[in-house]
Design a protein with these regions (language model features):
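Extended alpha-helical targeting/anchoring segments
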Residues: 2-479
Length: 479
């Protein structure tokens, strides 16, 4: 049902969803096969998975179909679309983005089924590096490459959210209805259980190219070190962009990537004329109830394939002065960012090794309690972009990145994920990720520079991070 409420003498529509639920056995299906069954019938569908099954939270995969409301920001306009197709357009230069997102989120409510402990509804989407002008007092000067241009931000509410509980081999279909809409749960169940699904091939259609040569990247590292020497910044994270043309179905690249580089955040978001997908090791920010959490990642070494050797490398990593100094700065930055709207900020774990397919990272955990009456999206603005993708002090690092990188970041180092109507927030940083647009795959990687960084080692770090993506491109051709 759909009710009109008066709030502060201004008319605001409050949309309350009537949610229908159906539970199915999921022991013969996978999120990938279900997504393949649904994506041609429901364009603009999303898939979120996790291969980090250490906790019950990460045992759930989600598929979202049929957007029914959304908020979208580009260079000039903010567009709000409500159920029933009512659209409101505002001048992007005259808005307070944090408040707009909060107001839009507050336009919806649903009755969550607490005992299921699943995401049944909310806003799913992303925001790009371009949003930084709405979070920080900074003006980006690098022009956006039209080939990489996508909306700065978009979140949607979906009619169908499918949750797959891998731990219990159960699947839930949540259908969100307004007014007197008829349920189509039967049809959705039929589509999910249909034995057939279409598959297509993927082919590379040319060589990889980059916005910078190896030597230019080494020179950029030297230039950043000069700024550190002068005291402009303590640490900075320049990056390098790559692109490769292709033909066919890029979903095969996602399938290859999730197999080669399992990670806590696997995602495939299809927006029709472009797609965002990746296998990110790093959370941008998590908010659950009153607690906000950042997981700074810094310290990267290539894996050997031998667990005993890898553990020795992890110990060495913790003792490496360059890696530890970088990590200390990022933990301090996370504490400072959270302190703006949180109390009781503390470091809960420090420099613990985490193992991924090609590399080992050192990870810490910093938490804070939201102050009373705080808009959770304020915390998002405070903590974006992650220090691990910018540097410290953050404002100066961002200014230098804008001046020297030569390529507007667009999706790279943006954030992607889920935001609850209640303000809960769980987003990954868009690293180890692809933007697919007009038959070209764009991808990017960087590394943290401190005073004693070695340009050759920094070049190698970028290659280590890109390795899994390049390997996925090769494997995708064989699927």
């Amino acid at each position: 049902m759909h009710s009109l409420q008066q709030e502060d003498k201004t008319q605001k529509m409050k949309y309350t969803f009537k949610t229908q639920t159906r539970k199915l056995l999921a022991d013969t299906t996978t999120p990938v096969s279900i997504y393949l069954r649904l994506r041609d019938i429901f364009p603009n569908s999303l898939l979120l998975e996790s291969s980090d099954y250490h906790s019950r939270d990460n045992n759930i995969s989600y598929i979202c179909c049929q957007p029914i409301a959304g908020i979208q920001l580009d260079e000039k306009e903010l567009t709000l679309t409500y159920p029933g197709k009512e659209r409101i357009v505002k001048n992007a230069h005259e808005i307070e983005l944090r408040q707009e997102v909060s107001d839009f989120r507050n336009s919806f409510e649903d009755h969550t089924i607490a005992e299921l402990n699943l995401i049944s509804n909310g806003l799913f989407g992303y925001f790009t590096f371009d949003c930084i002008e709405h979070f920080e007092d900074i003006k980006l000067t690098t022009t956006v490459d039209p080939a990489r241009k996508i909306p700065f931000m978009q979140y949607h509410v979906y009619k169908y959210v499918i949750a797959i509980d891998h731990f219990r081999n159960q699947l839930y279909i949540f259908e969100h209805l307004l007014d007197d809409e008829e349920s189509e749960l039967e049809r959705m169940q039929f589509l999910i259980q249909n034995k057939n699904f279409p598959e297509y091939t993927f082919k590379l259609a040319g060589e990889e190219s980059s916005n910078r040569t190896d030597e230019e990247h080494r020179q950029l590292v030297k230039k950043m070190k000069e700024h550190i020497q002068r005291g402009d910044v303590f640490q900075i994270v320049p990056s390098r962009g790559f692109k490769t043309p292709f033909s066919g179905d890029e979903f095969n690249v996602y399938r290859a990537l999730r197999s080669i580089n399992p990670s806590p955040y696997l995602f495939y978001f299809d927006y029709g004329d472009f797609k965002l997908f990746g296998s990110s090791p790093e959370a941008q920010l998590r908010i659950h109830g009153k607690q906000a959490t950042i997981f700074p990642i810094a310290g990267t070494f290539k894996r050997t394939g031998n667990m005993e050797e890898d553990q020795k490398i992890a110990t060495k990593l913790k003792e490496d002065p360059k890696e530890t100094s970088e990590h200390v700065m990022l933990v301090d930055l996370a504490r400072n960012d959270l302190s703006r709207h949180c109390t009781q900020v503390k470091v809960e774990s420090y420099m613990e090794p985490q193992y991924y397919s090609h590399i080992i990272h050192l990870v810490s955990k910093v938490t804070g309690t939201l102050k009373d009456n705080i808009n959770p999206f304020d915390i998002v603005g405070d903590t974006y972009p992650a220090g691990t993708l910018s540097g410290a002090p953050k404002h100066m690092a961002l200014t230098l990145i804008d001046r020297y990188e030569g390529l507007q970041r667009s999706f790279y180092s943006g954030a992607i994920g889920f935001m609850g109507f209640n303000g809960d927030f769980n987003h990954a940083i868009m690293i180890r990720s692809f933007l697919s647009k007009q038959n070209t795959l764009h991808y990017q990687a960087g590394g943290g520079i401190v005073l004693d960084s070695d340009p050759e080692m920094e070049l190698q770090e970028v290659n280590n991070k890109i390795a899994a993506l390049r390997k996925a491109l090769q494997l995708a051709e064989t699927l």
